[in-house]
Amino acid sequence: AHPDDLEFTCGATVAKLALDGWAIDIVITTSGNKGTKDAKVTGQQLAGEREQESRAAALILKANEPKFLGFPDGMLHADDELRELLVREIRRLRPELVITWDGFRPGFNHRDHRVTGISAYDAIYPAADDHLFHPDQKHEGLEPHRPSAMLLAGTDDPDYHIDIEPFMDIKISALLAHASQMGGRDA
Protein backbone atom coordinates (compact mmCIF):
# COMPACT_ATOMS: atom_id res chain seq x y z
CA ALA A 1 0.00 0.00 0.00
CA HIS A 2 2.46 2.66 1.24
CA PRO A 3 6.07 3.25 0.22
CA ASP A 4 7.54 1.72 3.41
CA ASP A 5 5.08 -1.14 3.97
CA LEU A 6 7.16 -3.80 2.25
CA GLU A 7 10.20 -3.03 4.39
CA PHE A 8 8.17 -3.04 7.62
CA THR A 9 6.21 -6.23 6.90
CA CYS A 10 8.39 -8.49 4.80
CA GLY A 11 11.68 -6.73 4.10
CA ALA A 12 13.77 -9.59 5.47
CA THR A 13 11.76 -12.16 3.48
CA VAL A 14 12.26 -10.13 0.31
CA ALA A 15 16.00 -9.84 1.05
CA LYS A 16 16.19 -13.62 1.47
CA LEU A 17 14.32 -14.25 -1.79
CA ALA A 18 16.54 -11.80 -3.68
CA LEU A 19 19.70 -13.44 -2.34
CA ASP A 20 18.22 -16.82 -3.32
CA GLY A 21 18.05 -15.56 -6.92
CA TRP A 22 14.43 -14.43 -7.21
CA ALA A 23 13.67 -11.33 -9.28
CA ILE A 24 11.92 -8.91 -6.94
CA ASP A 25 9.32 -6.51 -8.31
CA ILE A 26 7.52 -4.02 -6.08
CA VAL A 27 4.17 -2.38 -6.79
CA ILE A 28 3.19 0.44 -4.41
CA THR A 29 -0.45 1.48 -4.63
CA THR A 30 -0.36 4.81 -2.74
CA SER A 31 1.95 7.81 -2.92
CA GLY A 32 2.67 8.17 0.78
CA ASN A 33 1.56 11.80 0.53
CA LYS A 34 -0.07 11.95 3.97
CA GLY A 35 2.48 10.06 6.07
CA THR A 36 3.74 12.95 8.21
CA LYS A 37 2.81 15.27 11.02
CA ASP A 38 5.25 17.91 9.72
CA ALA A 39 3.05 20.90 8.84
CA LYS A 40 5.84 22.46 6.78
CA VAL A 41 5.80 19.82 4.05
CA THR A 42 3.21 19.49 1.28
CA GLY A 43 1.74 16.18 0.22
CA GLN A 44 3.39 16.53 -3.17
CA GLN A 45 6.82 17.10 -1.59
CA LEU A 46 6.34 14.14 0.73
CA ALA A 47 5.22 11.85 -2.11
CA GLY A 48 8.39 12.75 -4.03
CA GLU A 49 10.59 12.08 -1.00
CA ARG A 50 8.89 8.77 -0.37
CA GLU A 51 9.39 7.64 -3.97
CA GLN A 52 13.11 8.36 -3.65
CA GLU A 53 13.21 6.51 -0.32
CA SER A 54 11.48 3.50 -1.91
CA ARG A 55 13.99 3.46 -4.75
CA ALA A 56 16.87 3.54 -2.25
CA ALA A 57 15.30 0.76 -0.17
CA ALA A 58 14.74 -1.35 -3.31
CA LEU A 59 18.45 -1.10 -4.13
CA ILE A 60 19.32 -2.29 -0.62
CA LEU A 61 16.90 -5.22 -0.98
CA LYS A 62 18.30 -6.07 -4.46
CA ALA A 63 14.86 -5.42 -5.96
CA ASN A 64 13.97 -3.92 -9.32
CA GLU A 65 12.78 -0.32 -9.67
CA PRO A 66 9.44 0.01 -7.82
CA LYS A 67 6.25 0.70 -9.76
CA PHE A 68 4.25 3.55 -8.19
CA LEU A 69 0.51 3.59 -8.89
CA GLY A 70 0.29 6.96 -7.11
CA PHE A 71 -3.11 6.88 -5.44
CA PRO A 72 -3.44 9.41 -2.57
CA ASP A 73 -3.11 7.99 0.94
CA GLY A 74 -6.42 7.08 2.54
CA MET A 75 -8.31 7.39 -0.76
CA LEU A 76 -7.79 3.89 -2.13
CA HIS A 77 -10.89 1.98 -3.24
CA ALA A 78 -11.27 -1.71 -4.09
CA ASP A 79 -12.73 -0.88 -7.47
CA ASP A 80 -12.33 -1.91 -11.09
CA GLU A 81 -9.70 0.78 -11.74
CA LEU A 82 -7.32 -0.52 -9.08
CA ARG A 83 -7.97 -4.15 -9.96
CA GLU A 84 -7.26 -3.47 -13.65
CA LEU A 85 -3.96 -1.75 -12.78
CA LEU A 86 -2.95 -4.71 -10.60
CA VAL A 87 -3.98 -7.18 -13.32
CA ARG A 88 -1.79 -5.21 -15.75
CA GLU A 89 1.20 -5.49 -13.39
CA ILE A 90 0.62 -9.22 -12.79
CA ARG A 91 0.46 -9.85 -16.53
CA ARG A 92 3.47 -7.62 -17.22
CA LEU A 93 5.69 -9.00 -14.44
CA ARG A 94 4.39 -12.62 -14.47
CA PRO A 95 5.30 -13.33 -10.83
CA GLU A 96 5.47 -16.81 -9.36
CA LEU A 97 4.73 -15.39 -5.91
CA VAL A 98 2.77 -12.34 -4.74
CA ILE A 99 3.09 -10.99 -1.21
CA THR A 100 0.34 -8.57 -0.23
CA TRP A 101 -1.59 -7.36 2.80
CA ASP A 102 -4.19 -9.55 4.48
CA GLY A 103 -7.20 -7.51 3.42
CA PHE A 104 -9.53 -9.73 5.42
CA ARG A 105 -7.85 -9.12 8.79
CA PRO A 106 -10.38 -8.05 11.42
CA GLY A 107 -9.75 -5.24 13.87
CA PHE A 108 -7.35 -2.34 13.41
CA ASN A 109 -5.91 -2.21 9.94
CA HIS A 110 -5.29 0.81 7.70
CA ARG A 111 -7.84 1.19 4.94
CA ASP A 112 -5.12 1.31 2.26
CA HIS A 113 -3.74 -2.01 3.55
CA ARG A 114 -7.16 -3.68 3.44
CA VAL A 115 -7.97 -2.31 -0.01
CA THR A 116 -4.58 -3.26 -1.45
CA GLY A 117 -4.86 -6.80 -0.09
CA ILE A 118 -8.41 -7.38 -1.29
CA SER A 119 -7.67 -5.83 -4.70
CA ALA A 120 -4.54 -7.93 -5.17
CA TYR A 121 -6.50 -11.03 -4.21
CA ASP A 122 -9.23 -10.17 -6.73
CA ALA A 123 -6.67 -9.34 -9.42
CA ILE A 124 -4.87 -12.66 -9.00
CA TYR A 125 -8.06 -14.72 -9.20
CA PRO A 126 -9.87 -14.74 -11.44
CA ALA A 127 -8.99 -11.57 -13.34
CA ALA A 128 -5.28 -11.85 -14.23
CA ASP A 129 -5.63 -15.43 -15.44
CA ASP A 130 -8.85 -15.03 -17.43
CA HIS A 131 -8.55 -13.71 -20.98
CA LEU A 132 -12.06 -12.24 -20.80
CA PHE A 133 -10.99 -9.80 -18.07
CA HIS A 134 -9.40 -6.70 -19.60
CA PRO A 135 -9.04 -8.18 -23.11
CA ASP A 136 -7.53 -4.89 -24.35
CA GLN A 137 -4.36 -5.81 -22.44
CA LYS A 138 -3.78 -8.70 -24.83
CA HIS A 139 -3.36 -6.16 -27.65
CA GLU A 140 -0.51 -4.70 -25.57
CA GLY A 141 1.18 -8.11 -25.42
CA LEU A 142 0.00 -8.83 -21.86
CA GLU A 143 -1.10 -12.44 -21.70
CA PRO A 144 -3.16 -13.95 -18.86
CA HIS A 145 -1.08 -15.14 -15.91
CA ARG A 146 -1.78 -16.72 -12.55
CA PRO A 147 0.92 -16.66 -9.86
CA SER A 148 1.67 -20.02 -8.23
CA ALA A 149 1.35 -18.65 -4.71
CA MET A 150 0.23 -15.68 -2.65
CA LEU A 151 1.44 -14.85 0.86
CA LEU A 152 -0.46 -12.48 3.13
CA ALA A 153 1.45 -10.02 5.29
CA GLY A 154 0.02 -8.56 8.48
CA THR A 155 -2.25 -11.53 9.07
CA ASP A 156 -3.55 -12.58 12.48
CA ASP A 157 -3.43 -16.23 11.42
CA PRO A 158 -0.01 -17.00 9.89
CA ASP A 159 0.43 -20.48 8.46
CA TYR A 160 3.71 -20.04 6.60
CA HIS A 161 7.02 -19.18 8.23
CA ILE A 162 10.42 -18.23 6.83
CA ASP A 163 13.57 -17.94 8.95
CA ILE A 164 14.45 -14.28 8.46
CA GLU A 165 16.97 -13.80 11.27
CA PRO A 166 19.99 -13.87 8.92
CA PHE A 167 18.41 -11.07 6.84
CA MET A 168 17.34 -8.64 9.58
CA ASP A 169 20.33 -6.33 9.04
CA ILE A 170 19.30 -5.88 5.40
CA LYS A 171 15.69 -5.22 6.46
CA ILE A 172 16.82 -2.60 8.97
CA SER A 173 19.03 -0.90 6.37
CA ALA A 174 16.10 -0.79 3.94
CA LEU A 175 13.84 0.63 6.64
CA LEU A 176 16.37 3.34 7.42
CA ALA A 177 16.23 4.41 3.77
CA HIS A 178 12.74 5.69 4.63
CA ALA A 179 14.12 8.68 6.53
CA SER A 180 10.83 10.61 6.40
CA GLN A 181 9.21 7.78 8.36
CA MET A 182 12.12 6.88 10.63
CA GLY A 183 12.63 10.14 12.49
CA GLY A 184 14.03 12.19 9.63
CA ARG A 185 10.85 14.25 9.78
CA ASP A 186 8.11 14.54 12.42
CA ALA A 187 6.62 11.27 11.25
Regions inferred by a protein language model and the residue ranges of each:
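Active-site rim/loop-helix segments in enzyme catalytic domains that contact anionic ligands
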Residues: 1-94
